[in-house]
Amino acid sequence: MTEVETTHMNAGTESQQEPAELAEKQKAIGNAFYKEKKYAEAIKAYTEAIDLGSDSALAIYYSNRAATYMQIGEFELALCDAKQSDRIKPDVPKTQSRIRQAYEGLSILNEAEVYLKNKQAGLALNALDRLQRRIDSTTQPPMSWMYLKAQVYIFQNDMDRAQKIAHDVLRLNPKNVEALVLRGKVMYYSGENAKAITHFQEALKLDPDCTTAKTLFKQVRKLENTKNQGNDLFRQGNYQDAYEKYSEALQIDPDNKETVAKLYMNRATVLLRLKRPEEALSDSDNALAIDSSYLKGLKVRAKAHEALEKWEEAVRDVQSAIELDASDANLRQELRRLQLELKKSKRKDHYKILGVSKEATDIEIKKAYRKLALVYHPDKNAGNLEAEARFKEVGEAYTILSDPESRRRFDSGVDLEPGMEGGAGMDPFDILRAYQAGGSFPGGGFPGGGFPGGSYNSQGFGMGGGFPGFTSFQFS
């Protein structure tokens, strides 16, 4: 601990003796308070000594008050007093040391502010810890330090610690404007915008010229209004305009991680409605990068993965959601559904084989089959084993999807075990012959006993001029 000076200065003339003696008494009182670590009382006593003391004694009084300011972290006030002491009595080693220490403290404080401005939170906290070690451990640091540390915690999204600092200050002084602004900022960055607005309004009642409160009040209202406009547009089914509103809101305050996560999640939901699942996945990833335990974000990302048929990822997201909320029966039902889709994805996908969507009509399925059967038929691919395999695959897919009951069972996932899919072993040439026969094949054939369009060129492709036993086929 910095020691105060106790040297007694001799009084001058008799007219100066009485105030000088009073000044010395105040200095002694200040020294006693200093030793008891009652720094506020010590500062008051030294101030009275300065007001009463003679010029020859002022150097010690200023130096002692500087030492006291140092103990509570008021380095700027300490520097002013130490410099004043040095002007009155230059080159005193103890005074020079206090000037140096005050400059060092101010330099570290400036470091912390620069680090925070550059978003280097870890370095900012390190600087503040170094400052803390320079003052008496029993004293509360200056409000400016506490406010700065709370700012760092907000940047780190550690709202509990930031909230505690604001609470501690307001407990001591409920009308502290800086603390009200700080607590409002914590509320704001915790996503509690209504409470934040209340705190900023209270701060502005106490200090209408508080620039920080004014700026934050306007910002939170703008962000909240823009977000709500997006929500209203979404409820109205106006998804493109909702997307644009959420995008606008995301630009207002990128540092408000809590609200930004919600906005990303909202925009991801809109993107799913707009059939843009890749972008929805990116937005939900961004939301979860901010908060990995964001339940709604996990649900939305699971939907994005589902839309992209990334079943394993969708299952993992729902499992993570269940870990966060094990009581949600809907989540467990969703997990079972996605696990079934995952199993279905590991079997042969007849829709993909035919190149049609799962919503394809019977006519679309038949057209797709005809086109692929022409491409891979052995007449066109003599000796090509890969084409022969694809030809069989196409026939098998058509066998399943052209029959309503088989298709229903396939879609529902009933037939997941090998060998359970109806018609799986049917000869692909029999499928073609069904067209010629006029529709004995499950699900019916094309009108007129074959593909639309008339007769097949008898010159054919190698195997006797065309498909075996099939004469009414035309390539397109």
Swiss-Prot record:
GO terms for biological process: protein refolding. PANTHER family: DNAJ HOMOLOG SUBFAMILY C MEMBER 7, DNAJ PROTEIN P58IPK HOMOLOG. GO terms for cellular component: cytosol. TPR repeats lie at residues 23-56, 59-92, 143-176, 177-210, 223-256, 261-294, 295-328. The keyword Disulfide bond does not apply. It holds the Pfam family TPR_8. It is found in: Cytoplasm. Residues 1-22 are annotated as: Disordered. Residues 7-18 have a biased composition (Polar residues). Its main location: cytoplasm. Keywords: Chaperone, Cytoplasm, Repeat, TPR repeat. This is DnaJ homolog subfamily C member 7 homolog. The keyword Chaperone applies. Residues 349-414 form the J domain.
